[in-house]
Amino acid sequence: MAFTMQTGDLKKLKYFIDFALENPTFLNMPQLQFVKDFVEKFGGTVPPGQFNGGSAGGKCPFGGVAGAKANEPANAPEDSEDEKSLSDPESDVELDMEGVIEADSDPAQPMGNYSKKATEEEVEQASELRAQAASAYGQQKFDEAIALYTKAIELSPGNALFHAKRGQAFLKLKKPNACIRDCDVALELNSDLAAGYKFRGRARRLLGDFELAAHDLRQACKLDFDEETDEWLKEVTPNAKKIEQHRLKQERRQAERKIKERQRDQRRARKEQEKHNASSGGSSGEFSGGNPGNGNMSDILGAMSDPEVSAAIQDILSNPGNITKYASNPKIYNLIKKIVPGGDVGAAFGQAGEKAGKPSEPKPKKDSADFVDDGLD
């Protein structure tokens, strides 16, 4: 029965035999009963005893742990491990959500016409309205304060502080989204306005956006430090740090996932290539008994079933010199090249190379001295 083995299979077989010679009780494992039967069939014996790994580090050369049951898989495939790792659910970060409120959904408040340039009279009127709004705010009349700030904004829409102070009043009414809208405009008009960062940071804290809140409150402290802002910053910092650490962890996991996906794809590509090479018959590592030549033995045996080929081979084997008779027959001559190692037909049959198998050109015969014309009569 012909079969095909790759060079890598031979290396594994040699390693297996070397290991068995050093650890003969290894052959007593249930998985290797057929090998033990083979040894005993030819008069050999396997020492009794149980293989415990010992010098082999508890590992078998074909994988798995020494002493493992035959029906247990030695190791889970790497691809399965990768699939499990890639599909692991991402953990959620635990935050202290005390003080977080439901977001408001009121229509956007009037923001005024930014392109309008206020007159001196309008600026003065807006300043008076701001004073009235501050008074109403001090009396905790927050709706009234918002209405007065709105009038001041319509008169002088380019005043960033008016928007920030109206945002503060919205904050008191537990309307963080409205506060954020006003603070966004205030910071667009004046990016160095500490009040805009302060009140927007507080609004974001109420919505549970701790990382963004910490960023705003930190910036407010840099621009104009006050104790209330610092207290708010300390309140959000623990949750903000947890979120930042969790985000960095997820970024690392994502990077690792991409690396594992790439490695898995590379392994699969290698396996597919190996399968393709094996199915195409390989080349240098194939043999099935006899002298390995350049061809697949199954093809050679098939050609030998041809009566003409079989007769020619018998003729050559009986007299190697007869190979020259078939130099002009491609079917027979090419088959011989497949059988011969390296395809060197001449060397295989004791001749000086492949050209020896072909009829040599007749060499011109030198003229005898008796017939040399020396030009003399």
Curated annotation (Swiss-Prot):
**Species assigned in the record:** Drosophila melanogaster (Fruit fly)
Specify where the region named Disordered lies, as residue ranges. 68-123, 243-302, 344-377
**PROSITE patterns hit by this protein:** TPR, TPR_REGION
Which SMART domains does the entry mention? STI1, TPR
Upper taxonomic lineage: Eukaryota, Metazoa, Ecdysozoa, Arthropoda, Hexapoda
This protein's name: Hsc70-interacting protein 1
Q: Where are the TPR repeats?
A: 126-159, 161-193, 195-227
Q: Which GO terms describe its cellular component?
A: cytoplasm; cytosol; protein-containing complex
From the UniProt record, list the coiled-coil ranges: 239-276
